[in-house]
Amino acid sequence: VRITAKKVGLRTDASSKFEKGLDPNLALEAVNRAVQLVELLEAGEVVPGVVDEYPNKREPWQLSYNPAWINKFLGTSISEEEMQKIFEKIELKVDPVNHIVTIPTFRPDLEAQADLAEEIARFYGYNKIEATLASGTPTVGKRTYAQSITALVKDTVIANGLCEAMTYSFESPKVFDKLLIPADSDLRKAIVISNPLGEDFSIMRTVSFNGILTSLATNYNRRNESAGLFEVAKVYIPKALPLTELPHEIPTLTMGMYGNMDFYDLKGIVEHLMHVLGMSKVAEYVTEKALPWMHPGRTASVIVNGESIGYLGEVHPAVLKNYGIGTRAYLAVLDMEKVIANANRDVVYQALPKFPALTRDIAMLVKEDVTVKEIADIIKKNGGAYLEEAKLFDVYQGAQIEAGYKSVAYSITFRSAEKTLADADIADAMDKILKGLAEELGAQLRDK
């Protein structure tokens, strides 16, 4: 009633009377009064008993109040005794010890402590309440740690030349077939939307890269020679179906590219990201063959502190065909929850080296299935105390290289914090490195 009266701008006695609601318990009193008048005027015969269709009778209810809160809320200093008198004036029963009032059924508008405060102000007098300026303690607005890391990730990826994308969280069930996801995969157990716009938006996504691949396909079909996109968005993994609780929402960084960028460009971005987040020394890249939408021989898992936080590599040719992308494309997917958990933003400063480094380059023949990680691990294991860095600078297969083999070249840097190193200081370490490579990987040192 009050809302309607306000909308039409019409204030009447009826609106004032009925806007607070009517007490259904007054019906019996009205009937009794009518019967009394019938009997008084001898207009009929009164019979005993009442027929009442009233299954859910409204009973008085109780509200607790806090005098200190009411005074703070109103900006007053009214005593508890005065509050009690005001409550009694409006026919509320008061328990002053426990600060509880019993609300009669004819006051349905009193539902909360703020309503009681309004009644106090009405009887106390609005003109007695002194005007005061709002006061409070300002707080410094800032991002949470997770928000800061996410913002840093976005800035870093943008600085590496990728453009941020925003894709739909709703997808079609046909996406799973396009991505070659097996029929028994848990990724197919998606949340179904009860009122979808259509089949193409009928489930919540359980994988993050369909939107990126679709966007890459759009760019390719519009004859863009190259494209690099990324998105930080959530995937929705139900804990059980049908839903009994909220799903696990996993924020995920997805990067995709094609054209004048390849696997090594993508790996470079991931490595830069690991460096910025303080994880470069604990990040490893291990061959990954269990992802059906990725090329089995050109995909690597990103391992940090012994735990996989994502993967990167080339998209499976069959998937590219399903999306209408006629060239090689590359994806990197990182679990942002794990990235945030492993990020280390503590900066450690150290003095610039006082003594020059000593560098040795080695080139070796190894079988083509030997990974550079295996080679790097052996170099680090046998490099000794002076080893500073082992950097891959060349991988070659082709003319003058036997079939089934590849040439791998490393630049190995040694440095001491106490002196200038001589050849004799690193001779033992180099011998151990070469011996380890030969014995464990069958590596053959190349002279030229």
Predicted regions and their residues:
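Non-catalytic beta-strand/loop surface segments
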Residues: 6-17, 84-87, 91-93, 286-294
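Mobile "lid/hinge" segments at catalytic clefts and subdomain interfaces of large enzymes
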Residues: 1-58, 200, 218-223, 228
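Residues forming anionic-ligand binding surfaces in small-molecule and nucleic-acid pockets
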Residues: 1-18, 56, 61-64, 124-138, ...
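A carboxyl-terminal module marker
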Residues: 89-92, 239-243, 248-249, 254, ...
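Flexible loop/turn segments at secondary-structure boundaries
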Residues: 1, 108-109, 137-139, 172-178, ...
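Extended, well-folded interaction surfaces typified by the phenylalanyl-tRNA synthetase beta subunit core
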Residues: 63-225, 360, 413-415, 425-448
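A generic structural motif
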Residues: 18-26, 71, 105-109, 197-201, ...
